[in-house]
Amino acid sequence: MTRSRSVVVTGGASGIGDAVVRRFAEHGDEVVVLDRKPGNAAARYIEADLNDCSSIDAAVASLGQPVDVLCNVAGVSGASPVQLILGVNFFGLRHLTDQLVPRMSAGGAVVSVASTAGWYWRDHLDEVTRLVHAPDFAAGVQIGTESLANGKDAYTRSKEALIVWTSYAAQRYRGHVRLNTVSPGPVETPLLPEFYDSMGHEELDPLTELAGGRNGRPEEIASVVGFLASREASWINGTDIVVDAGAEMAFELGQAVPA
């Protein structure tokens, strides 16, 4: 019989995070949610603010047991202030992961939810690398706020940085844990209206059309997160998995929806 794993999920109170919590709980794993508010009753709850390093450190200290899987799902949209976007979506996530990985069991996994908004990281690699190699949370947020004009740009850059940093971190921690990202397109979550506000229907609607006329469901993203955290994904490391029904690639290639 497979032993139950200890799983930490950030942002587990709603949306994709809630679906991730339910997936692991249904498989008999012990789940701890780090969030600003309680969520699924199937999980233990620890209050944590990913925009505050001291809050992150306190949450890590409260775990009190080895961790097998970390799922970084918490995030804010481009409708939020630039500093908050950079803090929650990347620098807080990075701080939490760096604090937690040394406490993780060998053979564990870190899966972070990025976005197809980070698809073009290669086009901005110099700027992205500056964020990735920022020495700490405060310095990184300062670098980002000085160079990014609005929330939409900050959201994109935060997800680009997450994808690139994960590749670096996968090499740093290789042999101990695996790190990968999952990049959804538009997903039906409570946060989706904010994405329409910040990115516009003109940008998101074509992706929905190319995906077959609907947005993703939280459970469809959670299933990929669960796979990457499993032993079946043991040879996947430092990789970004796009989960958008092929929409971003179709858009990039200029393909029309078949009649």
For each predicted feature, which ranges?
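Short C-terminal tail/terminal secondary-structure segment
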Residues: L125, N237-A259
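Short, flexible catalytic-loop segment of classical short-chain dehydrogenase/reductase
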Residues: P184-E194
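Catalytic loop of short-chain dehydrogenase/reductase
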Residues: S77-G78, Q83, A106-H176, P186-V187
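Rossmann-fold cofactor-recognition segment
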Residues: N40-S54
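N-terminal Rossmann NAD(P)H-binding glycine-rich loop of SDR-like oxidoreductase domains
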Residues: A13, G17-R22
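A conserved structural motif in NAD(P)-dependent oxidoreductases
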Residues: L210-I221, E232
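Short, small/polar-rich loop/turn modules that mediate ligand/substrate recognition or access, typified
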Residues: H176-R178, I236-G238
